[in-house]
Amino acid sequence: MPHEMEENGAEVSDVMSENEDDTETFLKDDEKMTEQSTTDSTTEVKKKYDPKDPLRPRRKKARRACFACQRAHLTCGDERPCQRCIKRGLADACQDGVRKKAKYLHDAPPEALRPVLGPNYNPTPTPSRTNGHRHSSSQSDNLSATGSNFFSQGSTASLPVYSAGAQTPVAIDGLPSFNPQTSPTSFQGPINNAAHTPMNNMMPAGNMDFNALFDPSNPALYNFDLEGLNFGSQYAGWEFGILNKMALGAETPPRENSMSQTPTTEANYAALFGNANNGFDHPMLGADFSGMDQNNQSLYAQGNLQHGLPHAYAIAAGPTSLASPSTDTTASPHSVAGMDGSPNHNFAGIPTVPAATRPRPKHNKAGPKSILGKRQRDSAAIYESVKEPYPYTTGFHNMVAVLRNRLPGNKLLRIAKALGEIRPSFISCTKDLTRQDLVFMEKCFQRTLVEYDDFLQHCCAPTIVCRRSGEVAAVNKEFTALTGWTKDVLLGKEPNLNVNVYSGRSTNGTNTPDHNSQGEMTTPRPQRAMLDLSGGRPQPVFLGELLDDDSVVEFYQDFSQLAFEDSRGKVQRSCRLNKYRAPQDPDQKEPGSQKDAQPGILSSRVTRIDGSHGISRIEKDGKVECTYCWTIKRDVFDIPMMIIINFLPRYLPDQGPQQLAV
């Protein structure tokens, strides 16, 4: 036994134990205990270590010393009763000592400052004793004598309710039953205070004391095991639990009234104890609380201060509402107990202060929207809606038909040569894929497109997302402002009436149109019979229709290099984008003349920028000089899935910054 005390003993948890006199006292006391408890015939000489020797074995620190060891400034252990009290015959009176509170913890209730119960904690209940010489503040011995039912220790001690006067232990024998016909946060208290029925639907099985319900360090409040986390400090475990609760609460899509829909298997303490507007009603308190507030002293009254509710919350003692702490004058309108308009319950004798009423927003029938402004999306809807694979073969045929009707023969031959290099690789990658694989490939594309929609909303550069066949799948507003191509036209939801294209079969070898040929004509579209093969889905605009001739050739030459050879590469080049020009109705007036006729509120410079998106100065011959950078996103089969392209407009070669409107 002495060797176990020397090896497994704990260091003194008080500051006074570091002195040399205390160490000598401990050595003398240890020698006396050794003489009294030694019964073996074989005596071993115990090696004594110099207290000043830095190489002496260090003792293990105790979490908290008992009251007897704390008074004697001796080493104590984590177990209760400790070994020293057992040897001294003080096992029945061994309990945790009371430490002096720090100033910033003066308002914290004692049960919130309870130490974390370690694995060596002995849950044996010991009778609490009263000490007349101890001060009658919130530091009471019987608080830490036994663990509450929340920590599964089996103890049923009645903890006191603290007021400005003496300590008066009050226990709850029963609480009114919960009416399942009403809302989850509404309660009906009995008329007769003497008759009580157990609260089976609200509380878990087992006896429960009053202060334990108010205990903010209770792990059941946030459904995590504080003891099992094995934190050295309760505050670290409490912080970890709150962060864990926040992480588990971040769901997509958000559930409506998720805070008020508490499972019936857990204790709904948040509905029991609300803010200043949602406390107890007097009939609900029962006969045990009838004389508690005779002098208009609230539950948390300290000294001469009278509090309806605490004005601030100390560490590990937070408000019962998950919203910000509320005071008497500013009550939170989002308290958990009052989310669905439940009736207000108040303590007897405590005046209520009306909270600032705010208009409650109307909920959309489509579903609740997130408070943080995130767009609600459901991945399950994407997986259920995609039933057929995407016809990429038809898409490539339509792309070739568009390029064949537009480009001259020499440039079309260069594009065909570039596509011929990657065609065998596409065939070898897709020949072993089944129909289910192709459907899954399309689901991956649609799910990835949802993520890129958020990216497009926050990207300030003009950006488009295309399939590997060149069909536009997503676009942001900046690209529309730069080129004039609207989103509905690019995605095929509206007809493409662009007249800013020309047939290149009889061109003079440059990017300028040959006026001796057909001249301006609408964008050549594939035949209707070919479009019907796609199942009647809208035909988006191809990337080849947005770029000029030379830029299209350069793009597909770069695409042949990045498709399979350089999987992580990117391309940065100069290009020219075709502006969208719809045929104007002769009866329709010029938009500029209408704007000039109206009295403008903005200045002339801002009006010019707003009228032409600030792009008219960098446009030449219906084209916009740009620098673009693009990369390839691959699917789970390592096949090019989508192409993400960013554009930035740039100056013309003979243009200065002063000539720009932006």
UniProtKB/Swiss-Prot annotation:
Residues 66-94 bind DNA. Its main location: nucleus. The keyword Glycoprotein does not apply. It is found in: Nucleus. The keyword Metal-binding applies. Transcription factor which regulates nonfermentable carbon utilization. Activator of gluconeogenetic genes. Belongs to the ERT1/acuK family. This is Transcription activator of gluconeogenesis NECHADRAFT_59099.
